[in-house]
Amino acid sequence: MESWWGLPCLAFLCFLMHARGQRDFDLADALDDPEPTKKPNSDIYPKPKPPYYPQPENPDSGGNIYPRPKPRPQPQPGNSGNSGGYFNDVDRDDGRYPPRPRPRPPAGGGGGGYSSYGNSDNTHGGDHHSTYGNPEGNMVAKIVSPIVSVVVVTLLGAAASYFKLNNRRNCFRTHEPENV
């Protein structure tokens, strides 16, 4: 019975030795990268795609690849939205991107009025200010929260193993003095 198991094992080992002896395996083949890796796009909003190619039956294209941009509406006289030549939020909104949501006021009872801490528009740190929509605050939270989680879990594991080890040590000890 033993010889029947030995013969297939010997044949399998010979097959493995033959496969190993090919010498055509090289780790450098896996590391060669003929084209450089492109840097990923890190924009908040994706870049718009170029418009579609014009259709032959469309008379507006005029043979151009890109259609002409629509002219901006002329400002109406007497409109106070853009008076004085100053740049404001209305000038910035050209309709390409969706509007960003406004931060919600803090929930809770109480009336309006002024805060005792002042009304500064500083959203880049400090106490009693919202970090909603703040890229610096969100980036710090993305970095710090996993580190804090790992430290807490490590401390809990160390404490549990320490108390379990002390429980085993003290299992057979008596608190009475030894009698010789």
From Swiss-Prot:
Residues 164-180 are cytoplasmic. This is Glycoprotein Xg. PANTHER family: CD99/MIC2 PROTEIN RELATED, GLYCOPROTEIN XG. InterPro entries: CD99L2 (IPR022078). The gene coding for this protein is located in the pseudoautosomal region 1 (PAR1) of X and Y chromosomes. Residues 47-57 have a biased composition (Pro residues). GO terms for cellular component: plasma membrane. Residues 1-21 form the signal peptide. GO terms for biological process: homotypic cell-cell adhesion; positive regulation of neutrophil extravasation; T cell extravasation. It holds the Pfam family CD99L2. The chain crosses the membrane at residues 143-163. Its main location: membrane. Residues 22-142 are extracellular. The keyword Glycoprotein applies. Expressed in erythroid tissues, including thymus, bone marrow and fetal liver, and in several nonerythroid tissues, such as heart, placenta, skeletal muscle, thyroid and trachea, as well as in skin fibroblasts. Expression is low or undetectable in other tissues. Belongs to the CD99 family. Keywords: Blood group antigen, Cell membrane, Glycoprotein, Membrane, Signal, Transmembrane, Transmembrane helix. It comes from the Eukaryota.
